[in-house]
Each structure stands twice: as structure tokens, then as C-alpha cells.
């Protein structure tokens, strides 16, 4: 009897993932000043991509390009693998890309529920003869309260002015608003800037929760400690150029800190 050599079965290869949001060799120039040079970046569902850098590194230009505020001078923006020409932040939001800027786009004297529904107001009944229908305040209050609670944010009262909340609470409300209204990827502009340890921890826990919900998160920060607490992927910008592109498994906190020195 002749032994037959058996070829082991091939190990199935994982299909390549498609990023929710990506930049392909993007350059952004303002006249002769190149603010962002040949930037390539991929943001995947269920991952936190941290973009670090000092002032003037190009972080603000990156945010404006990803959010649809500015068009790239060269290169491509892709959503779900398809090249898109984002015309505005509203266009980006319609495609599931939402940005929470440092100013949070909140109206301080308005209650929490009004800020939660800002731009998404629910009215009672149809709009007859050009007349503005009244807001369905009770529906929006109930939904705001239940939506925040479902995301682990338990505010005693959503009818108080949002200015009465702590900085960390305002941040998580702004992030929760983006999640509730359909964001698949969220861009967070220095969400822990000027916050204390406790408030920063609140925001970072919510970033982790957004990741666990399957969102792609871009965390813009100058704080490597905060980045390493939640990050899966780290990008370091300097003078508009990518100086580091590393996965969490490829870099230690000490190495990340040293790169920023």
C-alpha cells in the first residue's frame, strides 16, 4: 500500500476590511502654505484612531478635511471605499460622518433636550400654509432622557440649561447626540482639553463605549496618556506630515510619548 501525501487544507484568509472613512494621499494647501501633505488614513468600525500633534501640526486642517469643511487640494476622501466629494459638514453628516468640535455647537442658555435635538427638531402636526408647526417638546424631552440613559449618561434633569452641566457632561451629551442621529464615524476635536482628571475619565469612558457600539472614532488630541488609554491606532502629525503610523500592538506608551518629545 502506497502512502499518499495529504495536502493540508488551506487556511481561510480573512477578507480585507473596508474603512468607514479614509484619506488617500491627501494634500491641503492654502495658497503657497501646505497645511497637510500626502496624508493617508483609514478609520475602521469599532476602532479608535488617535491623531496626536502639537499646535500647528495640521490637526485642525485634518478635521476640516474629514468633516467636509474644506476640500482637499490633492488626493481623495473615501467613505465605505468609494471616493466622495464632501460639500459641507451637513453632507458628511448625511453620510454618517459627524464631528464634535471643541465649541460643541451648543447653545448655552438652551436646555439639554433642545441642544440634543438642535437641527433635528420634532414638530406636532403638519406645516399648514407656511405656518411653523409647534415643537413637540414632551416627545423630545422623553427621547433625550431615554437616549442618554441608554448610552450610560444619567442626567437628573434634561430641562436645565446645558451651561449648568460640567464640561465632561457637555462633551458626552454632544457625542451622544451624534451617535443618536446616525453617526457611524465620529471625529472628536480635543474632547478632554481643559478638563480635569475626573471629567476626562468620563469622556474617555464614553469614547470606549462608542467604540464598543461599533463606531469608528477619530480622537484628535495632544495628550498621549489619554490617547493610549483608548486608542487602537496612533498617528502623529508634525508640520502637516505624518511622522508616525502605528497600531497599538506596535508601540508602547513610552515609545509614543518619546515620539512626541
Predicted regions and their residues:
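Intrinsically disordered, low-complexity terminal tails and inter-domain linkers enriched
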Residues: 9-13
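Glycine-rich phosphate-binding loops of nucleotide-dependent enzymes
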Residues: 3-5, 15-261
Amino acid at each position: 500500500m502506497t502512502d499518499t501525501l495529504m495536502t493540508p487544507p488551506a487556511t481561510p484568509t480573512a477578507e480585507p476590511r473596508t474603512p468607514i472613512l479614509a484619506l488617500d494621499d491627501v494634500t491641503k494647501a492654502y495658497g503657497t502654505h501646505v497645511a497637510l501633505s500626502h496624508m493617508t488614513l483609514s478609520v475602521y468600525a469599532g476602532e479608535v484612531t488617535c491623531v496626536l500633534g502639537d499646535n500647528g501640526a495640521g490637526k485642525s486642517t485634518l478635521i476640516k478635511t474629514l468633516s467636509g469643511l474644506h476640500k482637499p487640494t490633492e488626493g481623495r476622501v473615501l467613505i465605505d471605499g468609494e471616493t466622495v466629494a464632501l460639500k459641507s459638514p451637513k453632507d458628511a453628516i448625511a453620510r454618517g460622518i459627524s464631528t464634535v468640535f471643541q465649541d460643541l455647537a451648543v447653545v448655552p442658555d438652551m436646555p439639554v433636550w433642545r441642544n440634543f435635538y438642535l437641527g433635528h427638531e420634532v414638530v406636532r402636526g403638519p406645516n399648514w400654509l407656511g405656518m411653523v408647526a409647534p415643537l413637540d417638546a414632551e416627545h423630545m424631552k422623553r427621547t433625550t432622557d431615554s437616549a442618554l440613559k441608554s448610552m450610560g449618561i444619567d442626567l437628573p434633569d434634561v430641562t436645565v440649561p446645558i451651561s449648568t452641566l460640567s464640561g465632561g457632561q457637555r462633551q458626552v451629551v454632544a457625542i451622544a447626540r451624534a451617535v443618536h442621529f446616525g453617526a457611524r464615524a465620529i471625529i472628536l476635536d480635543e474632547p478632554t482639553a481643559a478638563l480635569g482628571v475626573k471629567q476626562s475619565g468620563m469622556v474617555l469612558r464614553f469614547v470606549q463605549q462608542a467604540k464598543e457600539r461599533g463606531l469608528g472614532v477619530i480622537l484628535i488630541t495632544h495628550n498621549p496618556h489619554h490617547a493610549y488609554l483608548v486608542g487602537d491606532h496612533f498617528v502623529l502629525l508634525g508640520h502637516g506630515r505624518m511622522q508616525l503610523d502605528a497600531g497599538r500592538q506596535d508601540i508602547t506608551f513610552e515609545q509614543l510619548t518619546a515620539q512626541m518629545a
